[in-house]
Amino acid sequence: MDLVSTSTSPFSCRICNQKAHGNHFGVLTCRACASFFRRAAFSKWSQLKCQKGGCSRNFCKRCRLKKCREMGMDTTKFQYNRDSFRATGQFQLPPPRSLASFVGRPELFLFCDTEAPNAKMLIDVRYLLEEAGRIINQGYETPASGKNQLENLTEGFKYIKVDMNNISSSKYASKDAIISMWEYYFFTVTRWLMYFEGFQKLNSHTQITLIQSVWNVWSRLHKYVATVDYHKANPDTLPTNVVIHNTLVDIENVEFDSTWLSDYPVEHVRRYLSVQHCREFDILGTLRKLNPSELEITYLFAQICFEHAGKRNQGDIMKVTEQFLDSLANDLHDYYVNEMNNSRYFLRLTQLLKINQAIQFSDISPQKQIRNNIIKKEAEKLEKLQKSQFSIKRLSISN
């Protein structure tokens, strides 16, 4: 609507003859008369008689309202819901951002039958703990000779480094192959930790608890390191090729037997797992760019394992792992300053640790999500996907 300035308007209000403000509800009026009509248009004054018996200049409310209507003020020109706030009772939740968030299920399984029977299949893994205990009792395979704990642990790098001459390829991931992979990583982590003096001094219960806590996260970092090494040695290989254990797998084309893991269709399970793989390219790119030494890689493995175990178990184990991390950090500082002659290593170390951060955070933006919620949501997705469970819950692959 066209407004007329009160300081320069030569026009008068059609209701009270005061200086006009503008066109309100179809009539040139002042602010006061416009506000009055807005308040009184649907009030009792429309039905009452004149309070003075006849108004000529100083209108009563009934006559003022009558004059407004006679001059042409129109209630159909009222505008509603223009306030910058809303009453509490009118608040409405925004619509969900996606169907998956509304339903509470991963996108890949929206149209699967949620009522279908999903009996759990028990996987007996007690023999893993028995074999790990035997390895611990055997002690070193070869005595460590490093000058500090990080160097001793680096002597176990032979368990991290993959023999490129003995890598086989596979186009089918069977149940036996997957369980064999779990065994390999569980026992390899145990042998590797035996090179760490602090681990040897722990009681057997704490040792087993640490192994149970870290074997899975250790295997994830191992997959990245082995894959980067393979791509360096074979630059023409497909970017979707990854090395798991000592096997080359095209993650996009591998046939996957998931019938023992889940009742969901195989293609849905594989698609879910391939989505997880798509998130890993940044980690692989960072490893290629930084090209860390054996000692730096060893520190990455130790850092992610002990930090993960501490946060997961809390209490006394967290105190122990914090001591381990402090000791290893001092050894790494000595390596950078005295051997690499690099006292300004902070930026490089920060970039290296971002690899571990990405693994733990599943590369979902930490600026937008709380870490605990991320882990909980991803674990819930995997829990819905699985129909198998370990005889020892702490060994679950979702941990």
Curated annotation (Swiss-Prot):
Entry-linked InterPro entries: C.elegans_Orphan_NR, NHR-like_dom_sf, Nucl_hrmn_rcpt_lig-bd, Znf_hrmn_rcpt, Znf_NHR/GATA
Parts forming coiled coils: none
An example molecular function term from Gene Ontology annotations: sequence-specific DNA binding
Annotated Gene Ontology cellular component terms: nucleus
DNA-binding residues (ranges): 10-80
SMART domains, per the entry: HOLI, ZnF_C4
Zinc finger (NR C4-type): 13-33, 50-63
Entry's localization field: Nucleus
Keywords, alphabetical: DNA-binding, Metal-binding, Nucleus, Receptor, Transcription, Transcription regulation, Zinc, Zinc-finger
Residue ranges constituting the NR LBD domain according to the UniProt record: 149-392
Top-level division of the source organism's lineage: Eukaryota
Function: Orphan nuclear receptor.
UniProt xrefs under PANTHER family: NR LBD DOMAIN-CONTAINING PROTEIN-RELATED, NUCLEAR HORMONE RECEPTOR FAMILY
Similarity annotation: Belongs to the nuclear hormone receptor family.
Stated name of the protein: Nuclear hormone receptor family member nhr-125
Species of the source: Caenorhabditis elegans
Upper lineage: Eukaryota, Metazoa, Ecdysozoa, Nematoda, Chromadorea
Gene: nhr-125
